[in-house]
Amino acid sequence: MAKQSLDVSSDRRKARKAYFTAPSSQRRVLLSAPLSKELRAQYGIKALPIRRDDEVLVVRGSKKGQEGKISSVYRLKFAVQVDKVTKEKVNGASVPINLHPSKLVITKLHLDKDRKALIQRKGGKLE
């Protein structure tokens, strides 16, 4: 396949370097998750950067099917933690599991004025 744009490199090494050395402001966008079909129909957009207090559904991996609220977003590790998705340690303690947002689907948005402005800026519709 021919290269789509001459302005963007298709070199794997450069793409990986850009991903792993991205500043926090770009990592926010890289940590985006798709919206559920209902939210996609309601707001008219496909994906949003994930944030604390969004409700999500795990759609890939061993924890597939579990739901919960985002308890923390760890930009440095490209990971989010969901409050009900945990594993049990040998001593009986429960610890949260790090998940990548691409393996999640947002089922309920935490809306505030900034999030509403973002949806409108992306060309979405608010009810």
From Swiss-Prot:
It comes from the Eukaryota. PROSITE patterns: RIBOSOMAL_L24 (PS01108). One of its GO terms (cellular component) is cytosolic large ribosomal subunit. Transmembrane segments: none annotated. GO terms for molecular function: RNA binding; structural constituent of ribosome. It is found in: Cytoplasm. The keyword Cytoplasm applies. One of its GO terms (biological process) is cytoplasmic translation. Pfam families: KOW, Ribosomal_L26. SUPFAM superfamilies: Translation proteins SH3-like domain. Gene3D superfamilies: 2.30.30.30. Keywords: Cytoplasm, Ribonucleoprotein, Ribosomal protein. The keyword Ribonucleoprotein applies. There are 2 genes for uL24 in yeast. Component of the large ribosomal subunit (LSU). Mature yeast ribosomes consist of a small (40S) and a large (60S) subunit. The 40S small subunit contains 1 molecule of ribosomal RNA (18S rRNA) and 33 different proteins (encoded by 57 genes). The large 60S subunit contains 3 rRNA molecules (25S, 5.8S and 5S rRNA) and 46 different proteins (encoded by 81 genes). Belongs to the universal ribosomal protein uL24 family. PANTHER family: 60S RIBOSOMAL PROTEIN L26 FAMILY MEMBER. Component of the ribosome, a large ribonucleoprotein complex responsible for the synthesis of proteins in the cell. The small ribosomal subunit (SSU) binds messenger RNAs (mRNAs) and translates the encoded message by selecting cognate aminoacyl-transfer RNA (tRNA) molecules. The large subunit (LSU) contains the ribosomal catalytic site termed the peptidyl transferase center (PTC), which catalyzes the formation of peptide bonds, thereby polymerizing the amino acids delivered by tRNAs into a polypeptide chain. This is Large ribosomal subunit protein uL24A. It comes from Saccharomyces cerevisiae (strain ATCC 204508 / S288c) (Baker's yeast).
